[in-house]
Amino acid sequence: MPRAPRTYSKTYSVPKRPYESARLDAELKLAGEYGLKNKREIYRIGFQLSKIRRAARDLLTRDEKDPKRLFEGNALIRRLVRIGVLSEDKMKLDYVLALKPEDFLERRLQTQVFKLGLARSIHHARVLITQRHIAVGKQIVNIPSFTVRLDSQKHIDFAHNSPYGGGRAGRVKRKNQGKGGEEGAEEEE
């Protein structure tokens, strides 16, 4: 089977100044609050946000009735509403400029699994996802940074073949059940 072509464009951009204590503290707080693996995950969200804000700024410079502003602006807003970053009552380009990285971090699968109570902590949520215990709809998703759409949010649950979702029990549990069955048979004799 042929492999998919690689994209060589960067998905994140690092800060120009590496040691700013205020920024470092803010990043550490975000990484802890949302259970991120490294700073690159924060930089990736910031990069996405900067591209979205750049597009919004470009569209805001155009005339109100400009067809490009109307078409592309509505498409941008609709996309942000669909993933749940922008609320229905704030469907204007001005509100797009007010978006923060936290809005995008809230929509990650890892955060949603924790908020739904499927995991004991944000870190446990990441482990459950990478170990393929979580499904969105019928599709198992093992990427913690997966952006959950609003309509998919209600379909997040344990995978049907996961021990948590009523599937086959794990190795240790099966072993312990086997021991329990053998002890019961010996007592009967």
Swiss-Prot record:
Region entry Disordered: which residue ranges? 160-189
Query: What's the short name of a Pfam family annotated to this entry?
Result: Ribosomal_S4
Q: Which molecular function GO terms apply here?
A: rRNA binding; structural constituent of ribosome
- Which InterPro entries did the record assign? Ribosomal_uS4, Ribosomal_uS4_CS, Ribosomal_uS4_euk/arc, Ribosomal_uS4_N, S4_RNA-bd, S4_RNA-bd_sf
Locate the transmembrane regions by residue number.
none
Domain of life according to the entry: Eukaryota
All copies of the S4 RNA-binding domain together span 107-178
| UniProt entry keywords in alphabetical sequence | Cytoplasm, Ribonucleoprotein, Ribosomal protein, RNA-binding, rRNA-binding
Which family would the database say this protein is a member of? Belongs to the universal ribosomal protein uS4 family.
Which protein are we looking at?
Small ribosomal subunit protein uS4
Taxon lineage:
Eukaryota, Fungi, Dikarya, Ascomycota, Saccharomycotina
